[in-house]
Amino acid sequence: MATMKDIARLAQVSTSTVSHVINGSRFVSDEIREKVMRIVAELNYTPSAVARSLKVRETKTIGLLVTATNNPFFAEVMAGVEQYCQKNQYNLIIATTGGDAKRLQQNLQTLMHKQVDGLLLMCGDSRFQADIELAISLPLVVMDWWFTELNADKILENSALGGYLATKALIDAGHRKIGIITGNLKKSVAQNRLQGYKNALSEAKIALNPHWIVESHFDFEGGVLGIQSLLTQSSRPTAVFCCSDTIAVGAYQAIQQQGLRIPQDLSIMGYDDIELARYLSPPLSTICQPKAELGKLAVETLLQRIKNPNENYRTLVLEPTCVLRESIYSLK
């Protein structure tokens, strides 16, 4: 394999001159540049990104660690991250954890060995333990939630407000018998959305029915199991707040398999406003998280941290909005 020394010897220049030509880091005459680049082509020389990073202290590469790429919410956020990385001439390496702590640690090590300039973390799975040893010395941005404290910038969404808005939309449609299917309540986002639900009921002077609070998971199966639990009760709610759109999709399937109609028999409110939500039958009312904005803001914040590593850490909060479609039946 050809090296810079080989190129320098054949071009009869110093290795530093070869480096300046390849990296464009200093003026070199056109004659020398053409000579060096001709030899580079003849030897089929490809400079190592890692080797170059040792000189310039950057690889123009960001790592993204995410729970799963097949979750629609994560997928849409990742699209925003990738788009903004490309706009800033950064490469993106994506690794998944699948909810496995060992895989989390292995992928973190892999990303650090690839000399990424910084990391985006979007994999705060509740199955991870807070005592997992993570020696991360890179610039970090935590997106949405993480299972332990880190020295990092954080981008969160106001999930308590989102839970309140979701429940209030059902109350405004005349519903007073409102259930909720949460994600795993070890996650702060699930806790906060539940608190928002409770706040809206309290404000409307609606008694809380603990049997209508079903803890589940932020996935399709979580919605199926959650609705099955609510439908087996002797007293059923007329509306259900699903704490993610993936839960709502599972709920749709379970409701329709029971021969029930949405929204006539059971109104459904989702959370996240994934692209699929508008294409469900009926289209899903939901709480919109600005996913593209989240992706863009995460990259902007990480690049700022890479550039200014000694700045104080920041916590940025995104505000959700309510999107009303056709999955809520008016009882008024």
Swiss-Prot record:
One of its GO terms (molecular function) is transcription cis-regulatory region binding. Pfam families: LacI, Peripla_BP_3. InterPro entries: HTH_LacI, LacI/GalR-like_sensor, Lambda_DNA-bd_dom_sf, Peripla_BP_I. Residues 2-56 form the HTH lacI-type domain. Residues 4-23 bind DNA. Coiled coil: none annotated. SMART domains: HTH_LACI. Keywords: DNA-binding, Repressor, Transcription, Transcription regulation. GO terms for biological process: regulation of DNA-templated transcription. Transcriptional repressor for the ribose rbsDACBK operon. This is Ribose operon repressor.
